Amino acid sequence: MSSVFLFISNESGKAIFLISGDVLVKSFCSLSDTCPFQDSCRSCSLLNAAKNYLAGTAPDSRIKTLDGELSAGIGEYKIGKNVLLKVMGLGSCIGVILSDVSTGICGIAHVLLPGASDRGETKYAETAIEKMVEDMVKMGARRSRITAKFAGGAQVFKHMSLDILKIGDRNAISVEETLIKKNIPILAKDVGGEVGRNVIFNPADGSMIVKYTAKGEVLWL
């Protein structure tokens, strides 16, 4: 049984669904805590529209199909085209998203440390961003049209005040300084705090979805 990722945006909200056959496998929804249907997704107009689209009973130009998903582990980055990109379990780490909307080519990095690496290690902010840009351009992205979004950098050791332990702040500063130095426009960011995050990039509309691991809050940026 084949599975498909669908992005839909209508007057109710926005959502990404992974549907296998007629079964909802997982979803990322802008309604989040305000969802009027709570756990009863069967009543959701977004999901019903997506299923009708798959069944061929209700063509909808507002629905877009995504070509799968890629997830970057700690110190890794992933590049793709028209794919959902994810970094999960961010504490002090930063999820950095680069995209060229004109080609649909995008990348995501799971940055662990600030600065650059002489050995090309992509766990460092500057090195990861440089390599992502290079690979995206090789894939067909236009350097002048690449933009950025990023999130993370929580202070996970909140009981410690030494500056050297504030790695989340240092990561966020390093990412921002690198992007500015490379003239890459920053369209959105969500950094700091004391709560971990999961970060997802939706190439269908260029949104960064930030899910707070403890609070359950979801942001679409």
From Swiss-Prot:
GO molecular function: protein-glutamine glutaminase activity
Record has Hydrolase as a keyword: yes
Any matching Pfam family: CheD
Top-level EC class: hydrolase
Reaction(s) catalysed by this chain's protein: L-glutaminyl-[protein] + H2O = L-glutamyl-[protein] + NH4(+)
InterPro entries reported for this sequence: CheD-like_sf (IPR038592), Chemorcpt_Glu_NH3ase_CheD (IPR005659), Cytotoxic_necrot_fac-like_cat (IPR011324)
Gene Ontology biological-process entries: chemotaxis
EC number(s) per entry: 3.5.1.44
CDD domains: CheD
Domain of life the protein comes from: Archaea
Keywords: Chemotaxis, Hydrolase
Cited SUPFAM superfamilies: CNF1/YfiH-like putative cysteine hydrolases
Sections of the chain in a coiled coil: none
Family: Belongs to the CheD family.
Function per UniProt: Probably deamidates glutamine residues to glutamate on methyl-accepting chemotaxis receptors (MCPs), playing an important role in chemotaxis.
Name listed for the protein in its UniProt record: Probable chemoreceptor glutamine deamidase CheD 1
Organism: Methanosarcina mazei (strain ATCC BAA-159 / DSM 3647 / Goe1 / Go1 / JCM 11833 / OCM 88)
Species classification: Archaea, Methanobacteriati, Methanobacteriota, Stenosarchaea group, Methanomicrobia
